[in-house]
């Protein structure tokens, strides 16, 4: 009888270990899923993000420009948007940097942007940064993420580092209806790389997700002989309501 009970106990322990391992594995794999991006791309009103992030959020939008006659020199625009959940207030700040060929940078200007509602901000007309923001739109306002676009696509590269808590996938595309043409270069007609990156922390503890679109065959197409070569956008928050939807 004792031997029988021992076998039952061992079996129950093994079942428990298997269940725990399976649950952890499923959670591990769920954190490598990017389907949640359908909630954010596109977004037509930044205030919609408050329902996902109860303790504030930030959107970091970066765009880089190459200019004719300045080889190796990059103009970088960084826009940091902050949403305060308690007051439902949204504020933004934009910085203009000159990145030199040796990758050192020179800060040229910092300006405050006034939120107008939706995904719109008042852009100053009399600043150095103004010319780079004439057609400014958030990536989340224009990019339409559809999981089916990537279901059959083979990633160029997968970076998976649980130790540092990060996961990235990079794809190569030549055409895609998902990409709009409002960024100073028509991504839909260019060869480009698109990259998705994220924190592997459970979403209900911490959320950090980045999407980057980088052109590979850019040519200046504007009167200023300037074209965007990179558009990157990160959504970051201390806590989210997405964890229960994994």
Question: Which role fits each region the language model picked out?
Answer:
Residues 1-16, 20:
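N-terminal Sec-pathway targeting helices
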Residues 15-66:
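N-terminal leader/targeting segments and the immediate start of mature chains
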Residues 60-67, 170-179, 212-218:
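Generic short beta-strand segments
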Residues 78-135:
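An acidic-aromatic
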Residues 126-208:
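Short helix-loop boundary/capping segments
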Residues 52, 57-98:
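N-terminal Sec/ER secretory leader and immediately downstream segment
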Residues 188-193, 198-246:
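Acidic, serine/threonine-rich low-complexity disordered tracts
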Residues 67-71, 99-103, 176-186, 221:
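Short, cysteine-centered beta-strand-loop-beta hairpins and adjacent loop/turn segments enriched
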């Amino acid at each position: 009888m004792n031997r029988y009970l021992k076998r039952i106990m061992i079996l129950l322990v093994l079942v428990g270990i298997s269940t725990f391992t399976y649950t952890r594995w499923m959670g591990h794999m769920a954190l490598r899923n990017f389907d949640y991006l359908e909630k954010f791309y596109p977004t037509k009103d930044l205030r919609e993000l408050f329902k996902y992030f109860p303790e504030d959020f930030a959107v970091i939008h970066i765009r880089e420009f190459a200019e004719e006659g300045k080889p190796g020199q990059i103009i970088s625009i960084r826009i940091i948007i902050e949403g305060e959940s308690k007051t439902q207030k949204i504020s933004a700040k934009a910085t203009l940097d000159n990145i030199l060929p040796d990758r050192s940078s020179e800060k040229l200007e910092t300006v405050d942007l006034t939120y107008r509602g939706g995904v719109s901000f008042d852009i100053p007309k009399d600043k150095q940064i103004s010319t780079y923001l004439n057609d400014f739109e958030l990536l989340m306002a224009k990019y339409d993420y559809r999981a089916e676009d990537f279901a059959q696509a083979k990633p160029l590269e997968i970076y998976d580092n649980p130790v540092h808590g990060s996961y990235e996938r990079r794809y190569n595309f030549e055409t895609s209806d998902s990409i709009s043409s409002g960024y100073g270069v028509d991504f839909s007609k260019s060869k480009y790389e698109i990259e998705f990156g994220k924190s592997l922390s459970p979403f209900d503890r911490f959320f950090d997700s980045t999407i980057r679109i980088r052109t590979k065959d850019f040519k200046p197409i504007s009167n200023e002989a300037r074209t965007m070569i990179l558009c990157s956008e990160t959504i970051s928050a201390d806590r989210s309501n997405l964890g229960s939807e994994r």
